[in-house]
Swiss-Prot record:
Classification via Pfam families: DUF1523
Record key words, sorted: Cell membrane, Membrane, Transmembrane, Transmembrane helix
Keyword flag Acetylation: no
Entry protein name: Uncharacterized protein HI_0453
Source organism (scientific name): Haemophilus influenzae (strain ATCC 51907 / DSM 11121 / KW20 / Rd)
């Protein structure tokens, strides 16, 4: 029974830390260096984009999209939507301004750095949300998500300490 409880605690610790790694990866900002190839706006409601087959049936909002392609040819689409006061707390209110800036940079085919959070999951139409965009040159060093790295190291340390604590707790009673 003690062995079962020990392995159960290991599983709980691994699941908790896996969840926390996922939260840090989703919520904290990342940076991509790319070129803007286009922008678009879609009117959506709670069911998704409004079309003939999906008419509006409630409050609607505009969702902006920024289409990009990096120098390797990889294409990525970013959602550009206000977070307002909601989670994650980026307090982003200027999506239209960011869209205009992206369009101007795309017209000039300039190299840009996009700061974003979230994941791109194609199967469920989940997009990364762009929070800022800035022009960079090929000589510039791209930004790095330092806070994320610090939290990853912290989570690895707590995972290691949790495992050592559980092992010590159960092995000391032999």
């Amino acid at each position: 029974m003690r062995k079962f409880f020990k392995y159960f605690l290991f599983i709980v610790v691994f699941l908790f830390h896996g969840f926390m790694f996922s939260v840090v990866n989703y919520v904290f900002p990342h940076y991509d260096v790319t070129r803007v190839t286009g922008v678009e706006v879609k009117r959506v409601d709670k069911d998704g984009p409004i079309t003939k087959s999906n008419p509006a049936d409630g409050p609607t909002r505009d969702v902006y999209y920024i289409n990009t392609q990096n120098d390797d040819g990889k294409i990525m689409v970013y959602r550009n939507e206000d977070t307002r006061w909601g989670f994650p707390f980026y307090f982003k209110f200027g999506s239209a301004n960011l869209q205009a800036e992206a369009q101007a940079l795309g017209n000039d085919n300039k190299l840009v750095q996009i700061k974003y959070y979230g994941w791109r999951i194609t199967m469920v139409d989940e997009y990364r949300n762009a929070t800022s965009i800035k022009e960079i040159t090929a000589d510039d060093t791209p930004s790095n998500p330092i806070v994320s790295w610090i939290l990853y190291v912290f989570l690895l340390a707590t995972l290691f300490l949790s495992i050592q604590f559980i092992r010590g707790w159960f092995d000391s009673d032999k």
